[in-house]
């Protein structure tokens, strides 16, 4: 894969996941990415331009190294997530086609592929976009148990037993 960034050709590496595997990767800028199964990321060996850009298919948790001069941008089929330094999860969904962005710490912006909307998400916010209907939902104070694949733990406060058992 070749990308043109400021008239510089950058070769991209790719991490591809298989069934049942969770893999960790540290990028050249010290950003850390944990991939869920069946996920892939296209990324450059280094970030020579004015931005740090990667492309994600599937689901990954990002802990992005802060660098205000070089925003970190994640491209997906549904849109782009832009961040300066934070921790968040991105999950592409297939049925229905769409994306979920859950922010654990900091703030990110999400811009739809058609560039008709930009949404700022803060810690605890979850954006859900259905590509088929173009319906978007933003939940505040979201359930961080959605990160169980990454954290390996569930947390409940005043929850009903049925909710705990079903999770």
Question: What feature does the model see in each segment?
Answer:
Residues 1-167:
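A residue-level detector for the "anchor" residue at the start of short, highly conserved motifs
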């Amino acid at each position: 894969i070749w990308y043109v960034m400021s008239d510089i050709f950058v070769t991209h590496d790719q991490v591809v996941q298989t069934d049942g595997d969770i893999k960790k990767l540290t990028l050249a800028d010290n950003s850390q990415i944990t991939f869920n199964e069946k996920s892939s990321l296209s990324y450059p060996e280094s970030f020579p331009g004015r931005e740090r850009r990667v492309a994600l298919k599937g689901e990954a948790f990002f802990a992005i190294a802060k660098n205000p001069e070089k925003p970190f941008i994640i491209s997906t089929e549904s849109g782009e997530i832009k961040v300066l330094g934070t921790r968040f999860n991105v999950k592409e969904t297939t049925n229905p086609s769409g994306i979920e962005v859950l922010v654990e710490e900091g703030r990110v912006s999400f811009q739809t592929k058609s560039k008709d909307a930009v949404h700022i998400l803060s810690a605890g916010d979850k954006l859900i976009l259905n590509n088929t209907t173009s319906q978007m939902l933003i939940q505040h104070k979201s359930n961080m148990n959605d990160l169980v694949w990454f954290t390996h733990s569930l947390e409940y406060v005043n929850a009903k037993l049925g909710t705990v058992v079903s999770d």
